[in-house]
Amino acid sequence: MRIEGSVAFVTGANRGLGLAFARELLGRGVKKLYAGVRNPEGVGLVGIIPVTFDVTDPAAVSAAALCCGDVTLLINNAGIGRVDSSALDPAVIDNAREFLEINFYGIIRASQAFAPVLLGNGDGAIINVLSDVTWFAPPILSAYAATKSAAWSFTNALRVDVRDKGIQVLALHVGFVDTDLTRGFDVKKSDPRLVAARTLDALEKGHEEVLADAQTEALKRSLSPNSPIT
């Protein structure tokens, strides 16, 4: 898919990776850019159109797809995460329910709402922001990892379903990204600007998957018995 001249809708575009996507898209010459956010007044980036959007609200998602009928690129970026003390933490169940509503059901809602829009506008694309914990889940991220694994499965099914209809589906796998949400983690983090750029490069090349950092590449290789994770 060609970014220049496209019309994009980015969920959670008011901060972090979503904001990085918005800036990168503007820099690449999108025709129009919608920012799907819960509070449109909190969007300060010049050049984007704020749209009230909550992935947990089916009516809001449907309304956004209806009012943004010229979209050709959907980026499902909105997400939530929180650490557990362990996989046996009683809070895992409640956390998983909360995370599923946004990280999994939210992607399904947005994809189902916007797919007819993309089809109506000709060739289009969907980018789903996933994680490296899709493949390797540390105990403190057990609930979060489960929701991202579920989202990965849906992404793969969606790709098969719409491929012959002209819609490209790209899965973004990445580890910790340097945003306000990861500020408390003392780990190596990726620059959100580089992640956004690498993802859009992959989209324009027609890829189905992008591994945005070295750790994610290593984790994917570890799925092979010949390259176990260490």
Placement of each model-derived feature along the sequence:
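Conserved mid-core segment of classical short-chain dehydrogenase/reductases
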Residues: 81-97, 120, 140-143
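A short, exposed helix-loop element centered on a Lys and neighboring polar residues
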Residues: 111-112, 156
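Active-site-adjacent segment of SDR/Rossmann-fold oxidoreductases
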Residues: 136, 157-168
